[in-house]
């Protein structure tokens, strides 16, 4: 099971993950607590990770990049059109996973710690 693209819906305590292989087939649907989330993602083989841009997403993007992942942050308004059914954490993660692979998607630049400290 090699995840090529991972969509992550970030929340305060529980994180929803949706992963697909290189053919776009769903191979991972997982809900993890904060304590298990980072360790799980770090141990994955490097892949493309998509997250909605928010204050905590910049921290996770910097962290996962250090482990070889390619991380892209998407403005929330660009994820919404990809939600296929009722809005849940699982459908959001799936929508993020799909949106991050779109060739014309606009992404948010990952902020450094210094840039975030200014805010």
Where are these regions (language model features)?
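Phosphate- and other anionic-substrate recognition elements at nucleic-acid/protein interfaces
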Residues: 1-119
């Amino acid at each position: 099971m090699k995840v090529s693209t991972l969509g992550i819906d970030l929340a305060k305590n529980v994180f929803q993950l949706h992963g697909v292989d290189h053919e776009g087939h769903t191979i991972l649907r997982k809900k993890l607590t904060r304590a298990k989330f980072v360790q799980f993602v770090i141990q994955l083989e490097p892949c493309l990770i998509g997250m909605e841009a928010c204050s905590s997403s910049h921290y996770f993007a910097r962290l996962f990049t250090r482990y070889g992942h390619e991380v892209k942050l998407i403005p929330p308004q660009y994820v919404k059109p990809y939600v296929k059914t009722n809005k849940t954490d699982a459908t959001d993660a799936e929508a993020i996973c799909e949106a991050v692979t779109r060739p014309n998607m606009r992404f948010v630049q990952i902020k450094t710690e210094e840039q975030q400290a200014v805010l």
